[in-house]
A protein has these predicted regions:
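Bacterial N-terminal signal peptides that target proteins for export
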Residues: 1-7
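Sec/Tat signal peptide C-region and signal peptidase I cleavage site
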Residues: 16-20
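Ser/Thr-rich, Pro/Gly/Ala-heavy low-complexity intrinsically disordered linkers and tails
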Residues: 747-750
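Beta-propeller blade termini and top-face loops
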Residues: 21-741
Length: 751
């Protein structure tokens, strides 16, 4: 989601000290963040994107959640005010979860099947595609079924020894609990055409009956199997098929089967918006067109379930379990009242009472005449004008009849979903699934601040607590902290996407807010106005408290006064995302500047010099590090290699060594240099954090620390004052490691 809100906080006084005493990674949170982009939910809790939920068929306290990049979690007290979640898959090779379902043929409901997929709203970034994950002990342990490795698993069904998976390559089926799979799509005997198979639906009452949507190729449509997926028959009619083939085809199709055998289908068109919802009483023709839910905003402008046009990722559907006429649909975000009207401004409330860009969900009643079928499931359609986070991903009905919904903010519950009397509650509890793409440490007050995908910019409320507070909502920017100039005060910079509402705040050592300014970014010396990147890299200066570098879309800008005024110093564009390849200032030289643009390395020696290109790396530069006491020592990483220079970046030697061959870390993401008698270079990747020493030529690598899940570590920061390594992960929030420089910080493997 790309909408936002700025929040003014009453900041709490800190408790002193936040230092780990061993080589164990420590999770800081968020778990959850407060003041997020939800409405009339206690504390306005958000945690991060959850792609799939599985509700226990008979026990409303048991709920599983598959986070987009945070692994599988389980709660045994889902009906509590603050459910307690347990992480289950941290040691697996990927935490990118696409789907999870119970096996209805297991009478004890101990068997679950899940699949890996990359579905992050951050460009679908994610970890390895391992295949399927299966548990037979209520999630306590999981087996990786690798026969479908490297496939996006978009739907799963477990029926004893029979496993069925809908993937980007079609439908696969196993009859031996996943040891081997057969591709059914495109095989004449199966009845399924070749093409991407999106979603897989069934019902516990008739476990042998399955439905799948084929969403690419020439045979798009809805197909039904009555023999647990062995053979399939097209059941969609000409109208439904035509919709799925309209334009460039459906971007997404979701299915849900009710207890009476009724089937609902939701189709997203090639514009990323819900194009149609259909119902069949028994899974065969005829299919009744239920239209699409809409609200009327200013000047009669109509908006459906996807004002943001993000239906390719954000769509959910669930049939009601007791009323065969009811269906629930989730889209992306609320529209503001004047959206689509030139010059109207983006103001709330909208027509249903939404005051923010929160969740957009509806209830459909097929027994009603056209024009009366759809009712909001949020705001005016609730008893308390509540709404979950935007960008819905999955739905399930729990054993008590509540609607459980997952989205880019976490997991939420709608009580009494069949009426307007209920409301939305947070089930996030201590779930930690925040996707940080930027992170910074404040050594003065011992706080972390991070920019996250869709849950905004958040910061630690108090050391020792997992609760964070939202600074701004929407998509977080690249936060940075200046904490070197003083031991009693610090300055934090933060924004939302496109450097929106860049904020400069100063804090004392007790985390008390002492100033609050929106810098003007006024161009000087004939510089053009700054044009931000979606994710705009920032860098504070190592040697000067008020200097700032901004990596804009139209060049590199320098500020000498904290962003009040800016000067363009280069037209090159700093590479955005991941490690932010920019170093600004070294010991005794505030004018030093080094940055990466594509595969090219640019440098300014000091304030008297100009920016020039000095080298080209083998691929796009992901991150840079410099020994600030000796600027001739420079490090650079690409996605697959590590490089070392001893002449200030003019020439590099590859020091990747055994990092890739021994540890298979996946894509390299970020790095940090740690000075000392035997300096360390630390590199973060899709799977783990690794370290090499100067005494070994920075080319012999080891795993750093223990206890870190196999999550994408998106950004690293080393704080020399606290001797602390901070890791921002894409799916598990913020982590720290105290660097004691003892031998126990090195591990030979993951724990």
């Amino acid at each position: 989601m790309q909408t936002h809100r700025i929040i003014t906080l009453a900041l709490l006084i800190a408790t002193p000290g936040l230092h780990a005493q061993s080589a164990q990674w420590e999770a800081l949170g968020p778990g959850p963040s407060h003041s997020g982009q939800v409405e009339n939910i206690a504390n306005r809790e958000v945690v991060g994107a959850v792609n799939s939920v599985a509700a226990h068929p008979t026990n409303p306290d048991v709920l599983f959640a598959g986070a987009v990049n945070g692994g599988i979690w389980r709660t045994l007290n889902a009906t509590a005010t603050a459910p307690n979640w347990t992480r289950l898959t941290d040691s697996l090779g990927s935490l990118s979860i696409g789907s999870i379902e119970f096996d209805p043929t297991d009478p004890q409901f101990q068997t679950l099947l899940a699949g890996n997929a990359r579905s992050s709203s951050l460009g679908r970034d994610g970890g390895a595609l391992l295949g399927l994950l299966r548990s037979t002990d209520n999630g306590a342990s999981w087996s990786v079924l690798s026969a479908l490795a490297n496939r996006e698993i978009l739907g799963v069904a477990a029926r004893g020894d029979i496993l069925v998976a809908a993937t980007d390559g079609g439908v696969y089926r196993s009859t031996n609990t996943g040891n081997t799979f057969s591709l059914l799509s495109g095989e004449a005997s199966s009845g399924l055409p070749a093409g991407t198979s999106m979603d897989l639906a069934g019902h516990a009452g008739t476990p042998s009956v399955l439905y799948v949507a084929v969403t690419s190729g020439s045979g798009r449509g809805i197909f039904r199997s009555a023999d647990s997926g062995e053979t399939w028959t097209r059941v969609s009619d000409a109208t439904l098929d035509a919709l799925m083939n309209a334009g460039s085809g459906t971007r997404r199709t979701e299915l849900s089967v009710g207890a009476a055998g009724q089937v609902f289908v939701a189709v997203v068109g090639d514009n990323g918006r819900l194009a149609g919802v259909f119902r069949s009483a028994d899974g065969n023709a005829p299919w009744v067109d239920l239209g699409v839910p809409q609200t009327t905003e200013q000047n009669g402008v109509l908006f459906g379930a996807h004002p943001g046009g993000q239906g390719s990722i954000h769509l959910s559907i669930s049939a009601d379990l007791t009323n065969p006429q009811l269906v629930y649909i989730g889209g992306d975000r609320q529209p503001y009242f004047g959206e689509g009207v030139s010059g109207s401004g983006n103001y709330f409330p909208n027509s249903i009472g939404a005051h923010d860009y929160s969740g957009r969900l509806f209830r459909g009643d097929a027994s009603q005449p056209p024009g009366s079928i759809w009712t909001p499931l949020t705001h005016s359609g609730t008893g308390n004008s509540s709404s979950p986070h935007a960008d819905s991903r999955d739905m399930a009905i729990d054993a008590a009849g509540n609607l459980v919904e997952s989205d880019d903010g976490g997991v939420y519950k709608r009580t009494q979903p069949a009426s307007t009397a209920g409301g939305w509650l947070s089930l996030n509890g201590n779930l930690q699934s925040t996707e940080y793409h930027g992170i910074a440490w404040d050594a003065v007050s011992n706080r972390v601040i991070g920019g996250a995908q869709d849950t905004g910019t958040t910061e630690l409320r108090s050391p020792g607590s997992p609760i964070f507070d939202s600074v701004s909502t929407g998509d977080g920017g690249d936060p940075v902290v200046e904490d070197r100039a003083s031991t009693t005060s610090s300055t934090r910079y933060s924004s939302y996407q496109y450097l929106g509402a860049l904020l400069r705040r100063s804090f004392n050592a007790s985390n008390g807010l002492t100033s609050f300014v929106y810098p003007n970014l006024s161009p000087l010396n004939g510089s053009p106005a700054l044009q931000a990147q979606f994710y705009t890299p920032l860098a504070v200066n190592h040697a000067s408290a008020t200097r700032l570098i901004i990596g804009a879309n139209n060049g590199v800008y320098e500020s000498l006064d904290g962003g009040d005024t800016i000067t363009q110093v280069s037209t090159a564009k700093i590479n955005a995302f991941n490690g932010d390849p920019v170093v600004y200032g070294v010991d005794g030289n505030a004018g030093y500047l080094l940055f990466g643009a594509a595969s090219n390395l640019f440098k300014r020696i000091d304030d008297a010099a100009s920016v020039t290109q000095i080298a080209t790396l083998p691929a796009s530069i992901v991150d840079l590090s410099v020994d600030t006491s000796n600027a001739n020592t420079v490090f650079a990483i690409t996605q697959t290699s590590v490089h070392h220079s001893i002449d200030g970046g003019a020439n590099f030697t590859a020091v990747t060594g055994d990092l890739i061959s021994t540890f298979a870390p996946g894509r390299l993401r970020s790095m940090a240099f740690v000075p000392g008698s035997d300096p360390m270079l630390i590199v973060a990747a899709n799977r783990g954090v690794y370290v090499a020493r100067a005494s070994n030529g920075y080319s012999q690598w080891s795993v750093l620390g223990s206890g870190l899940p196999n999550v994408i570590v998106y950004e690293l920061e080393y704080d020399q004052t606290d001797e602390l390594l901070l890791a921002g992960t894409l799916g598990r929030g913020a982590w720290t490691l105290a660097l004691s420089f003892g031998p126990d910080i090195f591990k030979d493997g993951f724990e």
